[in-house]
């Protein structure tokens, strides 16, 4: 059995009973972990979970019981610089697209996922439909940034007082006064996050709100058609294009294509129309018998909702059949 080491001090009143009254396994390091990290080269901890000061020569000033991060030996795969972005625009957009399975805590790829697991809306591109129409059909599921407030900061409030008060059309952001700046000099300068009130009157340009971005200037894919779904080289955004619903496995699926169908690009629509024409010609030439393309045998398809063969889960006719709907038991 692997030994465990915990450097947390014992409670003088509880002693060893503290492990049972208030168990804390945050700083427990097993010998098996060191073996997997050093010998098998496994990455057991994320970079955000390890205390960066604990691996320095000076060490962390906080004891392990008070530090919110883990004091453990990192693996060789930890603290590696991120790989450079690919040169192809489609592959680059794929690396910048947030993994939809990661948002639902269902991604099993981990660091090997081809999509990013760093979800920060302010680093995402601006949603062109929200800028142009003032709303987005995806709402909270949209992975692009919705700039709801494009007002500038009130320069008078930053100086110390605004006569308009809450009726001011500009933003009032409360900041604490920088003690070093009030004393005469702040070494951080413009990078300081505290307030640096200026005695001079602000210029007239500081009261003007920024110009909203032009939707025509965006060359990236819209929210319903991100990179990784469809062909980037053959895709051109057209706001007047007709959206055609398609199956989830057809080229050009949207963010919700895995559950409610996707969207076909122009090439996919052209190919589908050509297939329909060929099917019609084949049906007329063979006495009315229709010759379609390859079709999956439904007798081999198992519905994960009702556990019966013969249909897909999105076309399940047994809506009221009890059982393991969606594999909930397996996830437990």
Curated annotation (Swiss-Prot):
Residues 269-293 are annotated as: Disordered. Pfam families: zf-CCHC (PF00098). Component of the cleavage factor I (CF I) involved in pre-mRNA 3'-end processing. A zinc finger (CCHC-type) spans 301-318. GO terms for cellular component: nucleus. PROSITE patterns: ZF_C3H1 (PS50103), ZF_CCHC (PS50158). The gene is YTH1. This is mRNA 3'-end-processing protein YTH1. Belongs to the CPSF4/YTH1 family. It comes from the Eukaryota. Keywords: Metal-binding, mRNA processing, Nucleus, Repeat, RNA-binding, Zinc, Zinc-finger. It is found in: Nucleus. It comes from Cryptococcus neoformans var. neoformans serotype D (strain JEC21 / ATCC MYA-565). Gene3D superfamilies: Zinc finger, CCCH-type, Zinc finger, CCHC-type. A zinc finger (C3H1-type) spans 45-74, 93-120, 121-147, 148-175, 149-174, 177-199. GO terms for biological process: mRNA processing. Its main location: nucleus. One of its GO terms (molecular function) is zinc ion binding.
């Amino acid at each position: 059995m692997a030994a465990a080491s915990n450097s947390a001090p014992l409670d003088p009143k509880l002693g060893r009973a503290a492990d049972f009254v208030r168990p804390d396994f945050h700083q427990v390091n097993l010998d098996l972990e060191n073996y997997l990290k050093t010998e098998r080269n496994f990455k057991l901890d994320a970079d955000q979970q390890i205390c960066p000061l604990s691996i320095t020569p000076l060490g962390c000033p906080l004891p392990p019981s008070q530090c919110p991060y883990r004091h453990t030996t990192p693996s060789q795969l930890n603290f590696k610089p991120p790989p450079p972005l690919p040169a192809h625009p489609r592959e680059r957009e794929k690396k910048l697209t947030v993994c939809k399975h990661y948002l639902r805590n269902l991604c099993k790829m981990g660091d090997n996922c081809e999509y990013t697991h760093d979800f920060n809306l302010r680093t995402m591109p601006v949603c062109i439909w929200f800028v142009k129409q003032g709303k987005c059909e995806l709402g909270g599921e949209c992975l692009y940034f919705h700039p709801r407030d494009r007002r500038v900061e009130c320069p008078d409030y930053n100086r110390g007082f605004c006569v308009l008060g809450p009726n001011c059309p500009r933003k009032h952001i409360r900041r604490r006064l920088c003690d070093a700046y009030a004393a005469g000099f702040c070494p951080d300068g413009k990078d300081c996050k505290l307030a640096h009130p200026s005695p001079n009157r602000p210029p007239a340009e500081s009261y003007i709100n920024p110009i909203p971005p032009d939707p025509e200037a965006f060359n990236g894919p819209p929210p319903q058609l991100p990179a990784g779904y469809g062909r980037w080289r053959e895709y051109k955004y057209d706001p007047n294009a007709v959206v055609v619903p398609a199956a989830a496995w057809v080229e050009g699926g949207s963010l919700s294509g895995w559950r409610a169908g996707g969207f076909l690009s122009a090439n996919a629509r052209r190919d589908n129309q050509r297939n329909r024409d060929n099917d019609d010609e084949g049906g007329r030439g063979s006495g009315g018998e229709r010759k379609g393309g390859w079709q999956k045998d439904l007798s081999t398809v198992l519905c994960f909702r009702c556990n019966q063969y013969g249909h897909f889960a999105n076309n399940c006719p047994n809506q009221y059949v009890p059982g393991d709907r969606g594999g909930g038991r397996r996830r437990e």
